Amino acid sequence: MDYQLVPMDKSHLKEVAELDKALFTRPWSADSWESELYNDTVSLVVAEDPDGGVLGYGVLGVILDEGCLEKIAVRPDCRRKGVAQAILGSFLRYGEEHLAYIGLEVREDNSPALALYEKNGFTAVGRRKNYYAEVHKDAILMDKVFREVTP
């Protein structure tokens, strides 16, 4: 599959918002996506095909030396082709260089995402009961530590 990772810009917003709405039970609004473009504490990455189409995207929030993986999403027809791994890999490379850790929440029944995160060194550190109340599912909290945080 031919694609490249690029920083998200305004040209991606419509496709990203549509994909987000199709894939998530709590999608972000178009306005939220646009405001994230101008948020200095967020890294937005798009996997873009040669024609500029969005195959997937990722969002990493950063405060000081802490990262929060907010979203990784890939079009259903582009899954199992390394797109999510490439997006996550870009965030992990940034994390190794600049962060103490990256944390995330993932729905307990999202087996592909759980496998991806575990394969990349994330470990389960907790659970939020009924976090996804609309589908009665828990969130699994996971972290990948790059260096110990000292108070």
Predicted regions: what they are:
Residues A84, L88, D109-A113, N130-V135:
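Short glycine/proline-centered loop/turn elements that form peptide/ligand docking sites
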Residues P7-D77, L88-G95, V145-V149:
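Acetyl-CoA-dependent GNAT
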Residues G95-E105:
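Conserved GNAT acetyl-CoA-binding A-motif
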Residues G103-E105, T123-D138:
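Conserved catalytic-core motifs of GNAT/GCN5-like acyltransferases
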Residues V42, K137-L141:
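Short hydrophobic/aromatic beta-strand or adjacent loop that forms the aromatic wall/cage
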Residues R75, R79, R107-D109, E134:
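Residue-level recognition of the GNAT/N-acetyltransferase active site
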Residues Y117-E118, F122, M142:
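Conserved active-site tyrosine of GNAT-family acetyltransferases
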